[in-house]
Each structure stands twice: as C-alpha cells, then as structure tokens.
Amino acid sequence: KADHQDGEEEDPQAFIRDYMDAVNEYRKTFPAKEDVVSQIPDPAVREMLLRMEQLGIDTAFDRFDQQKPQCNFGLAGICCKICNMGPCRITAKAPKGVCGADADLIVARNLLRSAAAGAAQHGMHAREVMLALKWAAEGRLDVPILGEQKIRSTAEAFGIKQKNRQLKNVARDLADVLLEDLSRTVPDEYKTISACAAQERREVWETLDILPVSAYHEVFEAYHKSGCATDGDWKSIMQQFLRCGLAFTFSGVVGASIATDSLFGVGDRVTSKVNIGALEKGYVNIYLRRHPVSYRSEEHTSEL
C-alpha cells in the first residue's frame, strides 16, 4: 500500500492504486438480495421479502442490486460536487479538483457535510420534543408532564433554581436551557456538556478547541468551512467535524433524551407484540416511527 503522508510528494499512481484496492475490498462486503434472504435470522422478514417478490414489489435490497456497480469515486469519497465548476474527482491525471482541493480535502469536506446533515436531522427531532416540553409547561400544549423525577434531577445538575417553585416552571426553564444549547448564536457555555460530560473529557475537548457553540451554529459553520475557497486545510475541516459530533451528541441525543424523559417519564421495560405478527388482520394498522415521538395538539402542529 502507498504510504500517504500529509504534505509529502507522492506517486499519484500509487495513491490511486491504494484507494482502489480499498474500494475493491469494500465492495466484497456488499450483500446481494439473495444473500440477505438466505442469511437473515428473522423468518418473518424472510417470508415477507419472498412474498413481496411474488407480488412484484421492489425493496431496498432490489434497488441496491440495481445500483451495482456503485461509482468508484463516490465509494472512495473523492468525488466533489460542492461548487458549479465540478463535479470533480481525483485521478492520477487530475490529482486536484478545479478549486485546488486534493483527495484529503475532498474526503474531509464530504465527511463534514455528512456530519452536519446528521446533526441537523437529529437536532430537528430534538427541537420538537424540547418545544413540546416548554409549551406543556406554559400551558400552550395540552400534554401532561410525567417526568418529575427526571426534571428535578436534571435541573439540579444544570443549576436551575427549584426551591418553592412549581414543577411546570422548573420544566420550562429546563426546556429553555436545552433550546439555547441547540440554537445559541453568541459563544457561551454549552450547559448540557458542562452538566453531562465527564470533567476529563471536557478538558480534552477544550484543549483541542472543539467545544461547540450550539448545534445550529456548528451546522452553519460546517457548510461555511467546507465551501469552495473557504478553508483549504483538511485538519481544520476535521476539527469542525468533531465539533459537529459533540453538538449532535449533546443536543440531538442527550438533550432530546432529557426532554423526552421529562415530558413522558422515564421508560419502563414492557412486553410488546413486535414484527409482522403485530399487524391485526381486518384493521387499519397505524405505524408510528419517529425518534422522538412528540404528541401535540392540532393547534400547535404548524407552529412546530
């Protein structure tokens, strides 16, 4: 394999061979639909796939097979479509894109934009349940607040005043803190990180200069830094990748979980009917799939 060192001149042909070897090894892990059907451990899913095939209904597995062979440049992460001068791809003949970006920078930009998309998608789910908690506390949403224990313990960790205060007022302040961490524009303390992350981890993140401002800000900054002629240092791009990761974790995951448990109560273990057998013949079966699921009144749906 080519020894790819940042900042050193290298044989373009050796580099191309290196990543093409990696792509070819990666391709070997791609299952065909027949592999999925034969190896899947769930008999109900196997039966469903076979039945769908009989009915002529295509699935993700059919469409995956139809896409083969996938683009070599896309699989290697060295295709750039960010500006209108492209798309560009890295080859031995063209080791840099039109803007001058090399393979390292193109891969870093693509990774960063994927991380920013994930932070935005989970962040919007988090926003829904944070707003639901806030509006339930303010009486704008007709939903009971069931997670008193979670609210009390989290408020203590966040330094929110509780003495002689009603639960709804504490819950509102907690929701405001979570929403502020999600959407802050002026750099300040990311309170969810301060309250929920281990001290030694926070010190490492501060040393690395990757503590986020807010989830919203880091998504903005990710698209800004990865634009054409903005930041040409792949290491700086990957530093922003880590900031997006922390914002994703502490707003999109931790913040969303706090708001969900505060509104609906901490979950208990239950026995449920699952899989295809949970569907009732002769009924309209409604399938809810969101993480988290926010139940809200029709009056406020458009506002969310």
Give names to the regions the model predicted.
Residues 2-8, 300, 304:
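N-terminal low-complexity segments that are often proline-rich with Ser/Thr-Pro
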Residues 11-302:
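Metallocofactor- and cofactor-centric catalytic cores in central/energy metabolism, strongly enriched
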